[in-house]
């Protein structure tokens, strides 16, 4: 039988650090070596505290140290600060705070604003943890936000309206799928604004999208190579699914992807700084550790730096702490905490050769047909918006869905004239 990807990571990583761990039954309080998991198909997640996962008392202490920062004061208009308070209250019955001070307008009302999917993900946590705790008006506003969201670029759009959201990068694809699936499950009987579908129908149509995106990560890794900005926004929706999705297949896949992301951090950090070569890196993250989006996650898990947590509302560690069913493998923690020198060999992405010989029907790798619009989100998430193989379908979709009117596509608007002449000519020019 074949091991699942998660079992492979746990077993392989455990073998790699076996020389550094104590026997399975520690003699003097040292942590036990992770047990090699069995083989087979997807299985229920091992409960927190199980052999092979981080020590539960250790993790609880790390969580407390982070939440002390995040809940030092209440910012009633900051949804992530509110979620930090909700998570701490769920973990610690002795913790007291005043939910009545939370704003009734905790979320924005603009469904066409870029990064709206981020806020919709935050809503999943605030809604589920906040029902019966937060003011009724706040909960009603969150529910209205979920119902009134436009989750897909090809969902109906009122005439004359421009939707400036970016739907297609790796993290946005995962986040929108998470938002729609969990939002639909949370409000199954509500009628959603743009589609007229019920929440249950939204969840049903999105389940396979979620599964496919997770499987892509297990097969191809992360397209945004070691991004010290965006990796967090790829694993945050995975952690959200892990906590709130009841589907066994989704839970198993999400655990695999979460382990992979945490191992990616562990193998490529130095004193909690994600210091590998980067794709999609920005100035703030290049000049200082404090600008990296995963610093606090690494500080929580690996804690091999004296630098303090610098953002108590950071969703990376917050969503790990908020897990009731998932914990990081102990072997991954040890890799991240180790100062040993090692060679890391990785492969992320898939081959797309922009210099291959021109063809009217180029053959796509792994069966992701360039000419099929259903594969457009996949290819665009690899960064292949302007690859010559994708030009015809990219131009057609952009025109069909009025994407050239959006802020992020306006710079490409001049190329739409090729649609009225020859998309094939556009391919040749681009190549």
What are these regions (language model features)?
Residues 190-194, 241-253:
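Inter-helical turn/loop segments and adjacent helix faces that build the functional surface
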Residues 1-15:
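N-terminal secretory signal peptides and thylakoid transit peptides that target proteins
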Residues 252-320:
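Extended amphipathic alpha-helical segments with heptad-repeat/coiled-coil character used for oligomerization
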Residues 186, 209-212, 216, 240, ...:
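Alpha-helical scaffold segments in carbohydrate-active enzymes
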Residues 180, 232-245:
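Alpha-helical scaffold elements that line and support the substrate/ligand-binding pocket
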Residues 30-175, 187-188, 197, 201-210, ...:
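Ser/Thr/Asn(+Pro)-rich, low-complexity disordered segments
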């Amino acid at each position: 039988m074949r091991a699942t990807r998660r079992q492979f990571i746990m077993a392989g990583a455990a073998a790699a650090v076996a020389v550094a761990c104590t026997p399975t039954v520690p003699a003097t309080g040292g942590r036990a070596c992770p047990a090699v998991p069995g083989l087979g198909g997807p299985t229920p997640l091992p409960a927190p505290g199980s052999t092979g996962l981080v020590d539960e008392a250790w993790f609880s202490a790390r969580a407390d140290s982070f939440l002390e920062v995040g809940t030092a004061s209440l910012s009633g208009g900051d949804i992530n600060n509110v979620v930090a308070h909700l998570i701490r209250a769920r973990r610690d019955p002795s913790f007291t705070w005043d939910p009545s001070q939370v704003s009734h307008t905790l979320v924005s009302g603009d469904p066409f604003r870029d990064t709206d999917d981020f806020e919709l993900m935050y809503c999943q946590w605030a809604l589920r943890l906040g029902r019966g705790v937060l003011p009724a008006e706040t909960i009603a506003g969150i529910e209205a936000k979920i119902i009134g969201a436009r989750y897909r670029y090809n969902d109906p759009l009122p005439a004359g309206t421009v939707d400036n959201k970016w739907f297609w990068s790796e993290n946005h694809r995962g986040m929108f799928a998470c938002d729609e699936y969990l939002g639909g499950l949370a409000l199954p009987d509500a009628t959603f604004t743009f589609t007229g579908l019920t929440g249950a129908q939204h969840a049903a149509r999105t389940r396979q999208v979620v599964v496919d995106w997770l499987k892509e990560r297990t097969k191809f890794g992360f397209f945004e190579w070691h991004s010290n900005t965006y990796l967090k926004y790829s694993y945050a929706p995975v952690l959200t699914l892990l906590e709130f999705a009841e589907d066994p297949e989704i839970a198993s896949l999400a655990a695999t992807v979460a382990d992979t992301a945490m191992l990616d951090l562990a193998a490529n950090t130095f004193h909690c700084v994600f210091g590998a070569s980067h794709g999609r890196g920005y100035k703030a993250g290049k000049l200082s550790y404090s600008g990296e989006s995963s610093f606090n996650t690494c500080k929580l898990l690996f804690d091999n730096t004296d630098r303090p947590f610098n953002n108590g509302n950071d969703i990376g560690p917050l969503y790990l702490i908020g897990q009731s069913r998932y914990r990081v493998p102990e072997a991954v923690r040890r890799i991240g905490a180790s100062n040993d020198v090692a060679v890391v060999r990785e492969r992320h992405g898939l081959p797309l050769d922009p210099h291959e010989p021109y063809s009217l029907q180029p053959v796509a790798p792994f069966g992701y047909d360039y000419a099929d619009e259903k594969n457009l989100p996949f290819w665009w998430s690899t960064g292949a918006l302007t690859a010559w193989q994708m030009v015809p379908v990219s131009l057609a979709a952009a025109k069909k869905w009025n994407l050239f009117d959006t802020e992020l596509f306006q710079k490409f608007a001049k190329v739409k004239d090729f649609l009225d002449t020859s998309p094939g000519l556009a391919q040749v020019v681009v190549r």
